[in-house]
Every structure is written in structure tokens, then in C-alpha cells.
Amino acid sequence: MRIVKGDKVKYLNLEGVAISNPYMYITDMETYIDVYFSEVREIMTVKINSLKKVN
């Protein structure tokens, strides 16, 4: 599933397990992307393959 700007995503830990909360939203698209980390209300940059799309 392709991740695009505006998608709701979950962060995957080192074992590839999705961390359920909080949800994050894509704000920019590149190899490294900026996501809005809702619980702490800040933007953080993560690798795109560390994210899983939420339906």
C-alpha cells in the first residue's frame, strides 16, 4: 500500500511491529518523511519504510 501525503500511519519499531498509538499524519514525501506526531504535537522525520498505512 502506497503512503502519500495526508495519510494516517503508524510507526513500526525495529522488529517491524506497528506501535498502535499515536497515529501520525504524513506532511511531506521523500525517502525520509515528516510526520505529525499527534500525542506530542510535533513534527518528526522518519524513514518511509518505518511506517504502516492505517485504513
Residue ranges and their predicted role:
Residues 2-55:
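Basic/aromatic-rich interaction segments and small domains that mediate binding to polyanionic partners
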